């Protein structure tokens, strides 16, 4: 009888011990394959625990509280973006949260036009809001430190994928972009810009126009050569994308004569030389296409009268008129007004 009692007690102890071990070390964390759990800055322990319950990552707070007490997590909550994998143990989950071992955010920047676009892009991916980003972008000290003004500010943004922590401050994110911009403009690129009698900011601005003119790599260098020839001979760039930017009418499909007189320093039909700043964030390929533009005699270009996206280039105005007329007929034929 005594032996049965002892075996019974041992069985219960083992059963309870096994259950506790399963709850702590077993794959009890639930997530649809893999999800991200966000802890905002200033969030307390109770809110973290409730969020884990609400999101069905944990099913009970008892063992979470018990283990949190042992790990002294309650007073060490760290904001961040955490990757929770299905089947993770409660111990692993708590260790990750306690250590602040975040999953970084990959901020993918392609083509943006305005600093407001940049602010919204950052706010959509990070804890900081667009207002705090705009505060940094509009700050006089920021502009001075980056040696830019309101028009050239976006030249600090080189399209790429940037890996940063979700709870990084707006200032830290912008500083990261500027740091990468400085790395991009290495000695070789700076020297190529000097050879063109342009600053890196001017190269970037020209590249932004080229970026808006075409997405065809073979044409980018040729278009840049046209702009260089026009600048060097004192001819206005007369670039249609600058009119769209000046008007902030990015959906405009066809530039008409009435649009050309729009009063803005960005309208290169009205003002000679490059606009005072970029009209978008050009790709690194486009920037390099400008830096490596071939030497040509081309002064004019216009899209080919088809859907190829390529352009016809020429030196004489007479030939350009023929090319332009053909393209206008094409637009009329496909109903683009």
Sequence positions of predicted segments:
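Hydrophobic membrane-insertion alpha-helices, especially the h-region
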Residues: 7-19
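Signal peptide-directed extracytoplasmic domains
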Residues: 19-185
């Amino acid at each position: 009888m005594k032996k049965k009692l002892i075996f019974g007690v041992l069985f219960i102890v083992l059963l309870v011990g096994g259950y506790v071990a399963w709850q702590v070390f077993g794959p009890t964390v639930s997530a649809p394959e893999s999800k991200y759990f966000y802890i905002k800055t200033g969030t307390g322990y109770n809110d973290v625990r409730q969020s884990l319950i609400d999101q069905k990552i944990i099913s009970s707070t008892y063992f979470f509280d018990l283990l949190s007490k042992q790990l002294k997590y309650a007073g060490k909550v760290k904001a961040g973006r955490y990757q929770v994998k299905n089947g993770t143990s409660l111990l692993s989950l708590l260790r990750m949260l306690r250590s602040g071992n975040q999953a970084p955010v990959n901020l993918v920047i392609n083509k943006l036009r305005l600093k407001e676009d940049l602010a919204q892009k950052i706010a959509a991916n990070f804890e900081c809001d667009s207002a705090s980003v705009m505060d940094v972008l509009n700050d006089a000290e920021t502009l001075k430190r980056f040696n830019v003004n309101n028009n050239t500010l976006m030249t600090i943004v080189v399209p790429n994928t940037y890996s940063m922590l979700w709870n990084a401050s707006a200032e830290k994110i912008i500083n990261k972009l500027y740091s990468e911009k400085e790395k991009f403009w290495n000695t070789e690129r700076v020297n190529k810009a000097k050879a063109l009698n342009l600053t890196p900011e001017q190269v970037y601005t020209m590249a932004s126009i080229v970026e808006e003119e075409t997405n065809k790599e073979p044409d980018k260098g040729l278009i840049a050569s046209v702009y260089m020839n026009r600048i060097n001979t004192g001819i206005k760039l007369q670039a249609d994308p600058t009119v769209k930017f000046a008007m902030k009418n990015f959906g405009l499909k066809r530039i008409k004569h009435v649009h050309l007189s729009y009063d803005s320093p960005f309208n290169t039909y009205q003002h000679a030389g490059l606009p005072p700043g970029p009209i978008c964030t050009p790709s690194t390929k486009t920037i390099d296409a400008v830096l490596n533009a071939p030497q040509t005699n081309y002064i004019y270009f216009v899209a080919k009268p088809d859907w190829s996206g390529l352009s016809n280039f020429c030196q004489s105005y007479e030939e350009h008129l023929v090319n332009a007329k053909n393209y206008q007929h094409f637009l009329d034929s496909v109903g683009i007004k």
